[in-house]
UniProtKB/Swiss-Prot annotation:
This is THAP domain-containing protein 8. Coiled coil: none annotated. It comes from Homo sapiens. It comes from the Eukaryota. The gene is THAP8. The lineage of its organism: Eukaryota, Metazoa, Chordata, Craniata, Vertebrata. Residues 83-121 are annotated as: Disordered. A zinc finger (THAP-type) spans 1-85. PANTHER family: AGAP005574-PA, THAP DOMAIN-CONTAINING PROTEIN 8. The keyword Cell membrane does not apply.
Length: 274
């Protein structure tokens, strides 16, 4: 928290320079020394005020004899009492108004031959009555009246400002549109290339599948021919499965083993009688 002076009518804060062009120093109230504290408060004009340990007085309220210097550092003497206080409160509002207000210089006196500044022409709808007052030698005021015809308003040029932003927008959108079109064409070419690769892979898969079925069919036919040459005892049963007009699958099975009848006939076990 920055330090500031608690004395009335004083607004010194930490970092300011004092009357001796040195930084203003701050000192706490002697709360533990009752008589000295009362002397401080009497000189300040605040006898009934009780300061806290966080409030200070700046060095501008002490005389040079209240300080002692050691190694270039200014210390407050133990018996020092502040005695420099301003009794009259400064008029802050007046100082602010004086600082904010600028001095107004009186207007220069008008000369007789000084031409009056011309004001911009104001279009009117009818004749204007102009009254000119000026000092003359005969009478104090002379009145001259004349009729003025209103000036025709100057033709204003057609506004072409809204067209300029539209043209600028069109010229700015041209490169962006061209870049987007090129990107679309590039993506279309990539898609066509991927589709061609996919179709080639599908044809290759179909070809490999057909070749594998033909190889199996050939092996089955070979086994069939070998079984026919070996004889009926070593013959095998074959199952031919047609998967297409040019594809056939032959499955070979071992010959069925001889089976025993599950219900054998009952033998005649009767013993002949004697």
């Amino acid at each position: 928290m920055p330090k500031y002076c608690r004395a009335p009518n004083c607004s010194n804060t930490a970092g300011r320079l004092g009357a001796d062009n040195r930084p203003v120093s701050f000192y706490k109230f002697p709360l533990k020394d009752g008589p000295r504290l009362q002397a401080w408060l009497q000189h300040m004009g605040c006898e009934h005020w009780v300061p806290s340990c966080h409030q200070h007085l700046c060095s501008e309220h002490f005389t040079p004899s209240c300080f002692q210097w050691r190694w270039g550092v200014r210390y407050l003497r133990p018996d020092a009492v502040p005695s420099i206080f301003s009794r009259g409160p400064p008029a802050k509002s007046q100082r602010r108004t004086r600082s904010t207000q600028k001095p107004v210089s009186p207007p220069p006196p008008l000369q007789k031959n000084t031409p009056l500044p011309q004001s911009p022409a104001i279009p009117v709808s009818g004749p204007v009555r102009l009254v000119v007052l000026g000092p003359t030698s005969g009478s104090p005021k002379t009145v001259a009246t004349m009729l003025l015809t209103p000036l025709a308003p100057a033709p204003t040029p057609e506004r072409s400002q809204p067209e300029v932003p539209a043209q600028q927008a069109q010229t700015g959108l041209g490169p962006v549109l061209g870049a987007l079109q090129r990107r679309v064409r590039r993506l279309q070419r990539c898609q066509e290339r991927h589709q061609a690769q996919l179709q080639a892979l599908e044809r290759l898969a179909q070809q490999l599948h057909g070749e594998s079925l033909l190889a199996r069919a050939r092996r089955g036919l070979q086994r069939l021919t070998t079984a026919q040459t070996l004889g009926p005892e070593e013959s095998q049963t074959f199952t031919i499965i047609c998967g297409g007009p040019d594809i056939a699958m032959v499955l070979a099975q071992d010959p069925a083993p001889a089976t025993v009848d599950a219900k054998p006939e009952l033998l005649d076990t009767r013993i002949p009688s004697a």
